[in-house]
Amino acid sequence: MIDPATDRVLITGAAGAIGTALRNGLRANWRRLRLTDVRPIADPAPNEECIIADVSDRAAIERMMDGVAAVVYMTGVGGNYTIEDLFRVNARGMFDVFEAARLAGVQRIVYASSNHAFGCYPISERVSPALPPRPDSLYGTFKAWGEVMLRGYFDRHGIRSVSLRIGTYRPLPIDQRSLATWLSPGDVARLVDCALRHPDPGCLVVNGYSNNTRIKTFDPNWEFLGYRPQDNAEDHVPMLRGMGVDVDGPWEWPEHGGSHARAPERPTGR
């Protein structure tokens, strides 16, 4: 079990949108936070130690693992990525962080996976984490690979882990799909808090959504982990209607991954 009063937790990608939400949601109770990113980290609290570093700098990663009990891995490139950056950060960088954690004796890793790890399942199927991955893109493939890596670290080295298949993380839902897949800032902090506090999660994969009325997945691991999301995208339907968003028509995409499952890949990185 990770002790919020005494154990040091390292958050990578701490200057990003989710990293910032985690800082806001965790620092009141988690008293020893070590934060890292390639960008400056704004307004650190007294219990937040900041380190500017790149996950591709293995020596720096190994140094920052000193005294760390748990790693919350939120680093990653997405969107308009190049193939080179995808391999450098989402493959090699991820491996270096996991391996440095093992060498340092880290007890637990909380990993930002993605719903794009199962994005090719048809939307008619209520996907649970018990099903094998069906990634919808290279991005989703690397996220699924991270889950598989953590399985190996658990089986071979006993490192506990929770992989979070994060849905649409935004301050508010923006379209019909995100009414099902939204993960709010408050709920992402609650989910990570549960992943850190659980006495023994083993090697767990959970879907990272809020308590959305239109949710199209099924996850018994929420109850096991003690995750009780408080926010619901449905509360924002009037706002979206007022913006002219079609929230009542047929589902636009036939797969869970939405447009990712139909978008062309960029094998050359161009």
Predicted regions and their residues:
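Catalytic helix-loop patch of NAD(P)-dependent Rossmann-fold dehydrogenases
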Residues: 88, 122-161
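Glycine-rich NAD(P)-binding loop of the Rossmann-fold in SDR/ketoreductase-type enzymes
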Residues: 56, 85-96, 104, 115, ...
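Alpha-helical substrate-binding/gating segment
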Residues: 165-172, 182-204, 211
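Conserved glycine-rich Rossmann-like NAD(P)H-binding loop of the short-chain dehydrogenase/reductase
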Residues: 29-42
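Conserved Rossmann-fold NAD(P)-dependent oxidoreductase catalytic core, especially the SDR/UDP-sugar
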Residues: 96-134
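N-terminal Rossmann NAD(P)H-binding glycine-rich loop of SDR-like oxidoreductase domains
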Residues: 7-28
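Conserved C-terminal active-site "lid" loop/helix of NAD(P)H-dependent oxidoreductases
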Residues: 205, 211-234, 239-269
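NAD(P)H-binding glycine-rich loop region in Rossmannoid oxidoreductase-like domains
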Residues: 42, 52-89
